[in-house]
Amino acid sequence: MIAYLEGYIAEFGETSCVVATSSGIGYEVFLTTPTRSTLPNKGEQVRFYICHIVREDIQELFGFETWDERQTFIVLTSISKVGARTALNMLSTFRPNDLRQCVIEEDIFALTRVSGIGKKTAQHIFLELKYKLQIDGNSTTSSSPSIGQSLFYDILTGLQGLGYTKEESSVVIKSVLQHEPDLDVGSALRRCLKQLVKG
């Protein structure tokens, strides 16, 4: 399964782009509206975290700027009545931390802002999100999460994707970011993995 893709933009679609790799293969990648609207020009480099969905009749790639977005997409598509297109619409309307904030504030009505989601569907989705989205106990009621919170969640979802628990990951992440708060996601993730491997 494809989880990461890097290449240059060969073509644009209405809700997607074609990413050509150095091997000469082009992949159509479906994107959230914000990501699609901020793509660079043809021929320029892009990289996405990929959710590769395989069905009987088709394979599709969905691309995200952060690992947190990808993992949230996977959570959303695991909810009954939420397909890949609905999940993509949700992430076009809300960033992952915005969705967590909706859960914290029990703001079911906010979900109806997403195209194709009515009140009953919003209630159903909300109930499942309460148990499936990772909520940090220190989250605030601000609707605009800080860069630090976003970085924390990106690293956390990355470590959980590698099999580490939320509890052990959180301790290591806080330790790493306390000493080096300016790290990017990739560097911080590597630091955390080193600490976890050392035990």
From Swiss-Prot:
Residues 147-199 are annotated as: Domain III. Disulfide bonds: none annotated. InterPro entries: DNA_helicase_Holl-junc_RuvA_I, NA-bd_OB-fold, RuvA, RuvA_2-like, RuvA_C, RuvA_C_sf. GO terms for molecular function: ATP binding; four-way junction DNA binding; four-way junction helicase activity. Residues 144-146 are annotated as: Flexible linker. Residues 1-65 are annotated as: Domain I. It is found in: Cytoplasm. Keywords: Cytoplasm, DNA damage, DNA recombination, DNA repair, DNA-binding. GO terms for biological process: DNA recombination; DNA repair. It holds the Pfam family HHH_5. HAMAP family: DNA_HJ_migration_RuvA (MF_00031). Homotetramer. Forms an RuvA(8)-RuvB(12)-Holliday junction (HJ) complex. HJ DNA is sandwiched between 2 RuvA tetramers; dsDNA enters through RuvA and exits via RuvB. An RuvB hexamer assembles on each DNA strand where it exits the tetramer. Each RuvB hexamer is contacted by two RuvA subunits (via domain III) on 2 adjacent RuvB subunits; this complex drives branch migration. In the full resolvosome a probable DNA-RuvA(4)-RuvB(12)-RuvC(2) complex forms which resolves the HJ. The RuvA-RuvB-RuvC complex processes Holliday junction (HJ) DNA during genetic recombination and DNA repair, while the RuvA-RuvB complex plays an important role in the rescue of blocked DNA replication forks via replication fork reversal (RFR). RuvA specifically binds to HJ cruciform DNA, conferring on it an open structure. The RuvB hexamer acts as an ATP-dependent pump, pulling dsDNA into and through the RuvAB complex. HJ branch migration allows RuvC to scan DNA until it finds its consensus sequence, where it cleaves and resolves the cruciform DNA. Belongs to the RuvA family. Has three domains with a flexible linker between the domains II and III and assumes an 'L' shape. Domain III is highly mobile and contacts RuvB. NCBIfam families: ruvA. This is Holliday junction branch migration complex subunit RuvA. It comes from Lawsonia intracellularis (strain PHE/MN1-00). The lineage of its organism: Bacteria, Pseudomonadati, Thermodesulfobacteriota, Desulfovibrionia, Desulfovibrionales.
